[in-house]
C-alpha cells in the first residue's frame, strides 16, 4: 500500500513555562518541545495520533523540508494519504523528546542558571517524564484523548507508559517491537555503548561544548555496537557475508570485510549529527523503563490500570526485543480482560523491521487503524 507522502512540512516549537518535576528528582524550570503535525485535527479533536520516537529518532516523522528535499521523515513510509496512518483521516503528531538534540530542550541547550550549555548537568529523564511532557503538548493542542499513541522500540515503550499513566487519555495503544522492561543483556549493551562515550578523551565530563570539541570516536563506537543489535544475523549474512572490499586479505587492521565498511560508515554518519549526551540520556531512559516496578514486578497488576485497546506487534528476527517479550505484555493485558490484537510478523530485518515498508506489516497496522472509531 504505497499511498502518498505528506509532502513538504515545517517543524513547530512549543514553549512551556510550568516547571517539570522529573522522576530523577531534577526539575526543568521551563522547556521547549519541537514537533510536527500531519493531517487536520477534526472539530471533535478525536482523530489525533501521537507517534513516539525511538532512541535516535525525532519529530520529523514524515514528509520532507522544502529546502531539504532529501531529508525524509524516519517513518515516512507509513504516514500519508492512503497509508496506514492516513492523513485524510487522522491528525498525526510527532515530537522530539526532552533531552533530545533536534530542537527540544536537551543537554546542548543553554542552562538558564549558568548561561552555558547544560551538558552533563542536564537531569536524567525517564520515559514517564516524556509522557508527562507530551501530555502538556496535547493540552496545548486541545487534545483531551488520543485516538492512538504508537511507536516502535523505545517509542512503543512510551505508548505503553501512556496507557498506564494517562489511561483516560489513550483510546488505543500500538506497541511495536518493544518490551515491558530491558533484559540484562540489553542493559549490558547500553552500558558498553555509554562507556565508549564516557571514556573518549574529548568527552570532558559531558561539557565538551565549552571545549569546542565532540566525543566523536566514542559516539561512533556506540552507534556501531548498537547497529549490530538492530540487525538480524541472517540479514547481515545475506547483505555482507564474508565479502572482502578487495580480492585478498591485507593481513592488517584496516577495513577488509564489507560488513566492517558498513558499520564504520554508519558510525561516522551518526556521529556527524547526533549528540553524545543525548545518547547517554536515551540509553538510561531505556534501562530505567520498568512500569511493573511500581507493583513489585507484577506486570499484570500494572496493566490493570489501563483502559485502552491494544495492538502489540513483534518481529520473528528481532533478537533485541524478541516476540516472547511482546507476549509478556499480551498475557498481562489478557489477564485483565483487555481488548488485544497481537501480530508476530516474519521479517528478516531484525529489530529495525519496525521501520521497514512491508505489505504484511503495514497491512496489520492499517487494518487495526481502520477499525478505530473517531
UniProtKB/Swiss-Prot annotation:
Site (Important for acyl-CoA specificity): 320
Catalytic activity: L-homoserine + succinyl-CoA = O-succinyl-L-homoserine + CoA
Pfam family for this entry, one: Abhydrolase_1
Main subcellular localisation: cytoplasm
Residues given in the record as substrate binding sites: 223, 352
InterPro entries: AB_hydrolase_1 (IPR000073), AB_hydrolase_fold (IPR029058), HAT_MetX-like (IPR008220)
Keywords for the protein's UniProt record, in alphabetical order: Acyltransferase, Amino-acid biosynthesis, Cytoplasm, Methionine biosynthesis, Transferase
Keyword Acyltransferase: yes
Pathway the protein takes part in: Amino-acid biosynthesis; L-methionine biosynthesis via de novo pathway; O-succinyl-L-homoserine from L-homoserine: step 1/1
Enzyme class: transferase
Gene Ontology biological-process annotations: homoserine metabolic process; methionine biosynthetic process
Residue span(s) of domain AB hydrolase-1: 47-357
GO molecular function: homoserine O-acetyltransferase activity; homoserine O-succinyltransferase activity
Active-site annotation: 153, 318, 351
E.C. number(s) listed in UniProt: 2.3.1.46
Single GO cellular component term: cytoplasm
Subcellular locations according to the entry: Cytoplasm
Complex and partners: Homodimer.
Function: Transfers a succinyl group from succinyl-CoA to L-homoserine, forming succinyl-L-homoserine.
Family as reported in the entry's similarity comment: Belongs to the AB hydrolase superfamily. MetX family.
Protein name: Homoserine O-succinyltransferase
Upper taxonomic lineage: Bacteria, Pseudomonadati, Pseudomonadota, Betaproteobacteria, Rhodocyclales
Gene that specifies this protein: metXS
